[in-house]
């Protein structure tokens, strides 16, 4: 064996995740089989972000640095054979962004150590990646506790000469959620035509924007639930739930090259109608509950009033008059409730969460003290990229699992609205899989 038998960095107490402004301490451990002359032993703590225009390409076209500090552990001299430990400590900046890894870029924080040897001798280097979690407090976002509502009216033709309208209104109970929290969705559909609509679909979308020479967008569907269609001349109401899986936080504050957005999209294919609700995913849950509706004020999503046009267009007056009158809204059933569809080759990777026990479903877990960390969106098919890039597994051990449909809690789909209503007088809870 050579002179240097072991050269590695060890962080105190085996820590892997740190917060901005925290001290990072550790030792550089060295085992020598023979005396080693050296000119300097240094350790560097650094954080940076790199973005590429091609998927899974480490040749960054744009980079930015967040911190870069070096310490000299030993000056010129010679180390005898045996074990040697050199302690170090750095103070992480308060503005350091959360670690992240995606197909077009990553935010990496690491410690590097080097032994500078005399001329014509081999230098020695080692490094260790650590992770920073800068918790996003959802309560700092204005109106985060308010219901989220959007509506659209779609006019369409059918049977060559007939026309009709469909009014689609979607709402959620909050505007922001944490991992493991249930997103409550309500969709109200009024079919002002003699033709049945296609099924209504709700999708939780993630959009990651990378700033390279131009903006690159990577969009993926995180979870999806499908309801039935609405019969002709009918009003219908659809209530469902989506469990928020392990996801990186919104925005990534402190980083100007990568931005993360989340949306809930409710849509129908026939007629083509779509509403999109922006959402936030954070680490510290909203500490307020939605307000109950007050008399004379607009109702909450649980009792959202339907949007009805004042009168149909003139050319539809005869059809509306001859058609049946609208009855009370009917409740739509759910055809399928699937968290993200599995990729063709499942990745054997895991997401990092705390050991904090989950509390009742539908209320935030106690993430204020130990919020979960998810640094990666996993392997995805790029929405916009050069070439025909496909899903490629990353090498990171902290990566979002690509499979949600068959995993146990918290990746198991929550119960349907009808199932949850059956447990009257009890808190909302997951039904264990059989």
From Swiss-Prot:
A Gene Ontology biological process term: negative regulation of Notch signaling pathway
Ranges of biased composition (kind: Polar residues): 330-343
Keywords: Cell membrane, Membrane, Ubl conjugation
Pfam family, one: Arrestin_C
Post-translational modification: Ubiquitinated. Ubiquitination by WWP2; promotes localization to extracellular microvesicles. Ubiquitinated by WWP1.
Entries under Gene3D superfamilies matching the protein: 2.60.40.640
SMART domains: Arrestin_C
Entry GO MF terms: arrestin family protein binding; identical protein binding; ubiquitin protein ligase binding; ubiquitin-like ligase-substrate adaptor activity
Name of the protein described by the UniProt record: Arrestin domain-containing protein 1
Organism expressing this protein natively: Mus musculus (Mouse)
InterPro entries listed in its UniProt record: Arrestin-like_C (IPR014752), Arrestin-like_N (IPR011021), Arrestin_C-like (IPR011022), Arrestin_domain-protein (IPR050357), Ig_E-set (IPR014756)
Region described as Disordered: spans on this chain: 292-349
Compartments reported by the entry: Cell membrane
UniProt GO cellular component terms: cytoplasmic vesicle; extracellular vesicle; plasma membrane
Motif (PPxY motif 2): 414-417
Family label: Belongs to the arrestin family.
Keyword Protein transport: no
Gene that this polypeptide is encoded by: Arrdc1
Domain free text: The PPxY motifs mediate interaction with WW domain-containing ubiquitin-protein ligases.
Role noted for this protein: Functions as an adapter recruiting ubiquitin-protein ligases to their specific substrates. Through an ubiquitination-dependent mechanism plays for instance a role in the incorporation of SLC11A2 into extracellular vesicles. More generally, plays a role in the extracellular transport of proteins between cells through the release in the extracellular space of microvesicles. By participating to the ITCH-mediated ubiquitination and subsequent degradation of NOTCH1, negatively regulates the NOTCH signaling pathway.
Quaternary structure note: Interacts (via PPxY motifs) with ITCH (via WW domains); the interaction is direct and participates in the recruitment of the ubiquitin-protein ligase ITCH to the NOTCH1 receptor. Interacts with ARRB1 and ARRB2; the interaction is direct. Interacts with TSG101; may recruit TSG101 to the plasma membrane. Interacts (via PPxY motifs) with WWP2 (via WW domains); ubiquitinates ARRDC1. Interacts with SLC11A2; controls the incorporation of SLC11A2 into extracellular vesicles through an ubiquitination-dependent mechanism. Interacts with WWP1 (via WW domains). Interacts with NEDD4 (via WW domains).
Disulphide connectivity of cysteines: none
Motif PPxY motif 1, chain ranges: 401-404
């Amino acid at each position: 064996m050579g002179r240097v038998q072991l050269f590695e960095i060890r962080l105190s107490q085996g820590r892997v995740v740190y917060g901005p402004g925290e001290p990072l301490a550790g030792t550089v451990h060295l085992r020598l089989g023979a005396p080693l002359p050296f000119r300097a032993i240094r350790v560097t703590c650094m954080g940076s972000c790199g973005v590429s225009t091609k998927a899974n390409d480490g040749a960054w076209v744009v980079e930015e640095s967040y911190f870069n500090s070096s310490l000299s552990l030993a000056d010129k001299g010679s180390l005898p054979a045996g074990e040697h430990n050199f302690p170090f400590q750095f103070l992480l900046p308060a503005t350091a962004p959360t670690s992240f890894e995606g197909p077009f870029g990553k935010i990496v924080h690491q410690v590097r150590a080097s032994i500078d040897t005399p001329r014509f001798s081999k230098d020695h280097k080692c490094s260790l990646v650590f992770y920073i979690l800068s918790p996003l407090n959802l309560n700092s976002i204005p109106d985060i506790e308010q219901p989220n509502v959007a509506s659209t009216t779609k006019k369409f033709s059918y049977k060559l000469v007939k026309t009709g309208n469909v009014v689609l209104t979607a709402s959620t109970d909050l505007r922001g959620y944490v991992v493991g929290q249930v997103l409550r969705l309500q969709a109200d559909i009024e079919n002002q035509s003699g033709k049945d609509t296609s099924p209504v679909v709700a999708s939780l979308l993630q959009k990651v924007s990378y700033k390279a020479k131009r903006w690159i967008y990577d969009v993926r569907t995180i979870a999806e639930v499908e309801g039935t269609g609405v019969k002709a001349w009918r009003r219908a109401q659809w209530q469902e739930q989506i469990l928020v899986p392990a996801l990186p936080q919104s925005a990534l504050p402190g980083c100007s090259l990568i931005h993360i957005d989340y949306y809930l999209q409710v849509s129908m294919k026939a007629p083509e109608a779509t509403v999109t609700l922006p959402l936030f995913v954070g680490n510290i849950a909203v500490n307020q509950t939605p307000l109950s509706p007050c008399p004379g004020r607009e109702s909450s999503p649980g009792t959202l009033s339907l949007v009805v046009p004042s009168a149909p267009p003139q050319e539809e007056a005869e059809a509306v008059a001859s058609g049946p009158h609208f009855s009370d809204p009917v409740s739509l059933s759910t055809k399928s409730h699937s968290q993200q569809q599995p990729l063709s080759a499942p990745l054997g990777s895991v997401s990092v969460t705390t050991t904090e026990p989950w509390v009742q479903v539908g209320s935030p877990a106690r993430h204020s003290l130990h919020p979960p960390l998810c640094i990666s969106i996993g392997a995805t098919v790029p929405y916009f990229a050069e070439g025909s890039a496909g899903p490629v597994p990353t090498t990171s051990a902290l990566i979002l699992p690509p499979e949600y449909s068959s995993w146990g809690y918290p990746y198991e789909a929550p119960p349907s609205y009808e199932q949850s209503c059956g447990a009257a007088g009890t808190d909302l809870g997951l039904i264990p899989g059989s």
